[in-house]
Structure formats: structure tokens, C-alpha cells
A protein has these predicted regions:
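Short, structured coil segments at secondary-structure junctions
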Residues: 33, 53-55, 141
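N-terminal nucleotide-binding beta1-loop-alpha1 segment
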Residues: 1-8
């Protein structure tokens, strides 16, 4: 999307010598996991940059899924529907975010292999929290602090279970499970 408010033109801002979107496109191409690397955008300049780095941009994203409130799911569904209407059979879909410059091809390949081996319906990238969340602190309305899990006040960090959060690099799914994305997040 070309209309980011927080960081204008973020998808094509230069990061370490090239547009930030280039890193995701190059990683996708180098992973050898995809028959096609497609960029969905509403912006002509982003489209040109994406093509320059080897992606296809076969359509312009409709305005109704190109605003500040557009979620990822309808964007992916639109791309899949468009591809299928062109006669393509889509079994698996990966949404690699344009602003994921640190994603590497091996991470994509390994995730895809695990996705297939486990016969999963959905996958996404995760990273561990740098500090045990069991020792997280909350601040109430009067400014007082307390632990979310007071029972871990004296626990050694190395004794606590490692926890993870969405790394924001990619999601992958079987194409007809797109509408269930958020249900999967809630089932973990």
C-alpha cells in the first residue's frame, strides 16, 4: 500500500542501499519455494520498484482494500481470487510482508518444509521474547506497578518457559483456509 501514515512511502524507502520491499522479493525468489512472486499494491511507484526486483504485479489492488483499515486477509483473498480467475490453481499461499528486510531465503524454505511435513493449514514466523514474559509488569490507573504473574517474582529467568511472538515476516496457508487466519491465531 502506498499510503502509510506513520512512515510515508515506507515500502520503497531506501534501507541499506535498496528499497525495503526489495529484501522480501529477493528472499522469496531465492527461496525457490514459489511458482510466482506477486506484489499486491495500489501504488504505481511501488509496482515499478517491485517489478525491477523481479516480482510480478499483474493487478492493481482495489481501493476498498487499500486504506488504513484494510486487513491482510482480504488482500490475500483478492490476490488468490484474481490468480484463480486467470486459470491458476493455488494450493498454498505465503504473504511475505514488504517491511521484513531481515527475512532470509532459508527461513522461508525451512518454514515451507515444516508446513508441508506437518500437513499444517497455517504457519507464520515467530521469534522469542528477549525477556521472560512471566515476569512482565503492569501499571494500573493510579500508577502502581504489579506483576502479571506474581508467582514468578523469585523465579530464575532460565527456569521459565521460553515464549514467542509473531515476528511479522510472513504467514503461509492453504489457499482455501484464508478466511480462518484469525481463528488460528486464537486457537494457539
Amino acid at each position: 500500500r502506498g499510503g502509510s501514515k506513520r512512515i510515508p512511502r515506507k515500502n520503497i524507502k531506501t534501507f541499506n542501499g535498496k528499497p525495503i520491499i526489495a529484501y522480501s522479493i529477493e528472499a522469496a525468489l531465492a527461496s525457490s519455494c514459489f511458482d510466482k512472486v506477486i506484489v499486491s499494491t495500489d501504488d504505481e511507484e511501488i509496482s515499478e520498484v517491485a517489478k525491477d526486483f523481479g516480482a510480478e504485479v499483474p493487478f492493481i489492488r482495489p481501493v476498498e482494500i487499500s486504506n488504513d483499515f484494510a486487513a491482510t486477509n482480504p488482500v490475500i483473498s483478492h490476490a488468490v481470487d484474481w490468480m484463480e480467475n486467470q486459470g491458476n490453481l493455488i494450493n498454498h499461499v505465503c504473504c511475505l510482508y514488504a517491511t521484513a528486510p531481515f527475512i532470509d531465503p532459508n527461513s522461508i524454505s525451512n518454514a515451507y518444509k515444516k508446513f508441508k511435513d506437518m500437513k499444517a493449514d497455517f504457519c507464520f514466523s515467530v521469534t522469542s521474547f528477549p525477556f521472560p514474559i512471566q515476569r512482565a509488569i503492569k501499571i494500573n490507573k493510579s500508577g502502581k506497578v504489579g506483576l502479571f504473574q506474581p508467582e514468578h517474582f523469585h523465579s530464575r529467568s532460565q527456569d521459565l518457559e521460553e515464549t514467542y511472538h509473531d515476528a511479522g515476516n510472513f504467514t503461509g496457508e492453504r489457499s482455501r483456509h484464508l478466511i480462518l487466519i484469525f481463528q488460528y491465531y486464537l486457537r494457539w
